[in-house]
């Protein structure tokens, strides 16, 4: 049996019970689904193509800045206008094209800090309008990252929004503890090292507050991870996720070995064993952004370097002064090279996360 057998909707954007069943199946079968940050139709189809060819589910997500870029850099982001419109545009685009790839897709929004809550509000309003018309939210899930705030404010704000989301059977991802580095709206580059490791009690406090509302939530607990790539050693300790599972299991008194759905942030540069340790301890989603950005660049960079004598002018190249160069500078040609290398990176990650051939 594979993923398709446990889903009501086999292809395209999945929501509600299907999202919960997908993550449950992933946890039980010890694989994680990569979440790819998309900033354009090009990056979206690169991810969809890689997942299709690997017979895998995929998560596509927009960050606050990525959503604004999707809308167009010429649009003002005052009041989160561009980020709201861009996220909604990306969602509708992905909903329209994803079924053509024949795989299940989770449509997600990435880190939303306190100062970005107007963006979250705008997306939720779009969800509720879509729900009123179609009986399901526009997005499968959203993430609140209030890790800069006190745990009390973090959790209480998540509770407030989660009640609203639960009415649409929507998934919530939240972050407790600090992931190092910098991500849209949250900068923890100078965080104290001890703060980079979430404690079991913190995780249980989240579970205790959210589970009575709905079981549809996941927790990004910090274990020394950092967003982006940084020189020097990063002391990742994904094994501590087992302590979170054990503590919550004992507090709840449940028989389920891993009651928590966990998320791996800041995975750039992590080893295969570190990923596997996290996945074995309940990680069902791994964020991929920095590595994919660089992979996308490499295809375009190498194309430009290899074809430089064919793209210096519209006409004239080493084959002759009158030879046209349109087939070399056509964006459909060189952008495609970025899609190929980004797709190759995602394909490799799907293998690392044990997601390949899970459909």
From Swiss-Prot:
SUPFAM superfamilies: Aldolase (SSF51569). It comes from the Eukaryota. GO terms for cellular component: cytoplasm; cytosol; mitochondrion. The modification Phosphotyrosine is found at residue 310. It is an enzyme of class 4 (lyase). One of its GO terms (biological process) is glycolytic process. The active site is at residue 110. Dihydroxyacetone phosphate binds at residues 228, 266-268, 287-290. The modification Phosphoserine is found at residues 56, 63, 76, 83, 96, 147, 268, 313. GO terms for molecular function: fructose-bisphosphate aldolase activity; melatonin binding; zinc ion binding. Keywords: Glycolysis, Isopeptide bond, Lyase, Metal-binding, Phosphoprotein, Ubl conjugation, Zinc. Pathway: Carbohydrate degradation; glycolysis; D-glyceraldehyde 3-phosphate and glycerone phosphate from D-glucose: step 4/4. Zn(2+) 2 binds at residues 145, 175. Its cofactor is Zn(2+). Binds 2 Zn(2+) ions per subunit. One is catalytic and the other provides a structural contribution. Zn(2+) 1 binds at residues 111, 227, 265. The modification Phosphothreonine is found at residues 11, 150, 179, 290. Its EC number is 4.1.2.13. Homodimer. Catalyzes the aldol condensation of dihydroxyacetone phosphate (DHAP or glycerone-phosphate) with glyceraldehyde 3-phosphate (G3P) to form fructose 1,6-bisphosphate (FBP) in gluconeogenesis and the reverse reaction in glycolysis. Belongs to the class II fructose-bisphosphate aldolase family. Present with 1020000 molecules/cell in log phase SD medium. This is Fructose-bisphosphate aldolase. The lineage of its organism: Eukaryota, Fungi, Dikarya, Ascomycota, Saccharomycotina. The gene is FBA1.
């Amino acid at each position: 049996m594979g993923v398709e057998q446990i889903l009501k909707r086999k292809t395209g954007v999945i929501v509600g019970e299907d999202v919960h069943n997908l993550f449950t199946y992933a946890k039980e079968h010890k694989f994680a689904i990569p979440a790819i940050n998309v900033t354009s139709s090009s990056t979206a189809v690169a991810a969809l193509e890689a997942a299709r060819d690997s017979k895998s589910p995929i998560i596509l997500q927009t960050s606050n800045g990525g959503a604004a870029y999707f809308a167009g850099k010429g649009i003002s982001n005052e009041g989160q206008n561009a980020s709201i419109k861009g996220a909604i545009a990306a969602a509708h685009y992905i909903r329209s094209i994803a079924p053509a790839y024949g795989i299940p897709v989770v449509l997600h929004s990435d880190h939303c800090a306190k100062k970005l809550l107007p963006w979250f509000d705008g997306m939720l309003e779009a969800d509720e309008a879509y729900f009123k018309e179609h009986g399901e939210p526009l997005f499968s899930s959203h993430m609140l990252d209030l890790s800069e705030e006190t745990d009390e404010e973090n959790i209480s704000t998540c509770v407030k929004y989660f009640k609203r989301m639960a009415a649409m059977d929507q998934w919530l991802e939240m972050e407790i503890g600090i992931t190092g580095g910098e991500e849209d709206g949250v900068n923890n580059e100078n965080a104290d090292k001890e703060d980079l490791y979430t404690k079991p009690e913190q995780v249980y406090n989240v579970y205790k507050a959210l589970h009575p509302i709905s079981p549809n939530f996941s927790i990004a607990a910090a274990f020394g991870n950092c967003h982006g790539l940084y020189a020097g050693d990063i002391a990742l300790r994904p094994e501590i996720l087992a302590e979170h599972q054990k503590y919550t299991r004992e507090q709840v008194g449940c028989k389920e070995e891993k009651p928590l759905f966990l998320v791996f942030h800041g995975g750039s540069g992590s080893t295969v064993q570190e990923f596997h340790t996290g996945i074995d301890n309940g990680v069902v989603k791994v964020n991929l952004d920095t590595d994919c950005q660089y992979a996308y660049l490499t295809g375009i960079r190498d194309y430009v370097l290899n074809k430089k004598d064919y793209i210096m002018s519209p006409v004239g190249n080493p084959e002759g002064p009158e030879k046209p160069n349109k087939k070399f500078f056509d964006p459909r040609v060189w952008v495609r090279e970025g899609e190929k290398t980004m797709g190759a990176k995602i394909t490799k990650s799907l293998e690392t996360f044990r997601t390949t051939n899970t459909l």
